[in-house]
Amino acid sequence: MQTPSLELKGSSFTLSVLHINSIDLEKVAKELDSKLAIAPQFFIGAPLVVNLSSISDSSYNLAALKDLLTSRQLVIVGITAAINTLSEQAKTLGLAIIKSGKQAQSQPQLPKTTKLVKQNVRSGQQIYAKNGDLVVIGTVGNGAEVIADGSIHIYGTLRGKAMAGASGDKHAVIIAKTMEAELVSIAGQYWLTDNIQANSTTKSGCIRLDGESLTIESLPL
């Protein structure tokens, strides 16, 4: 039997969602550039869905927003939660209209896996645990990046960058035996070194989301 030249199959992919909360594109650009400066490898080239639930202005210039994002090497695959006029703009721009939450049919949740790294993560290295948690038995050095769609556990010193809940999981946590991170992020909310030091009284810690803000808790010795 001859193999068909194409096949259409169902599948699921993890996409990051960029929430636009302001109609001021200059403000959006400024805040976006600050995030890109912190972790460019994490954002650049990654497929994104733009959530427009906070935009109710029917005259909003979606084309200008698309140009702003693509000029920074962000890959926009579609929009979600937009009013009708913006959905029509999206169609003319070749963007998909993506349904989410109650609008979409429920998909079976993939089993969460754990990626185990039994060595130090050195400067310039990046480790990504897709659809699961990341456990590092060792030190994450300055200039190294550890990323997980789930939680991150460091049984050693965290000196580099740790980004948990990369696909939007707000229940993810970052735990480190010694917390000296350059940056920590959970579901897009981030702290730099100064924030960590200002909110922590011990070296070890568990960072999690409390509402829309990060918080750190001491670990029992």
Swiss-Prot record:
Query: Keyword Cell division: yes or no?
Result: yes
In terms of superkingdom, the source organism counts as: Bacteria
What SUPFAM superfamilies is this protein classified in? Cell-division inhibitor MinC, C-terminal domain
Q: Which GO terms describe its biological process?
A: cell morphogenesis; division septum assembly; regulation of cell division; regulation of cell septum assembly
Q: Which InterPro entries match?
A: CAP/MinC_C, MinC, MinC_C_sf, MinC_N, Septum_form_inhib_MinC_C
| Keywords linked to the UniProt accession | Cell cycle, Cell division, Septation
Q: Does the keyword Ligase apply?
A: no
Entry-linked NCBIfam families: minC (TIGR01222)
| Role according to the record | Cell division inhibitor that blocks the formation of polar Z ring septums. Rapidly oscillates between the poles of the cell to destabilize FtsZ filaments that have formed before they mature into polar Z rings. Prevents FtsZ polymerization.
HAMAP family in alphabetical order: MinC (MF_00267)
Subunit details: Interacts with MinD and FtsZ.
Q: Which family does it belong to?
A: Belongs to the MinC family.
Name of the protein in question? Probable septum site-determining protein MinC
Q: Which organism is it from?
A: Shewanella sediminis (strain HAW-EB3)
Ranked from the top, the taxonomy reads: Bacteria, Pseudomonadati, Pseudomonadota, Gammaproteobacteria, Alteromonadales
Q: What is the name of the gene encoding this protein?
A: minC
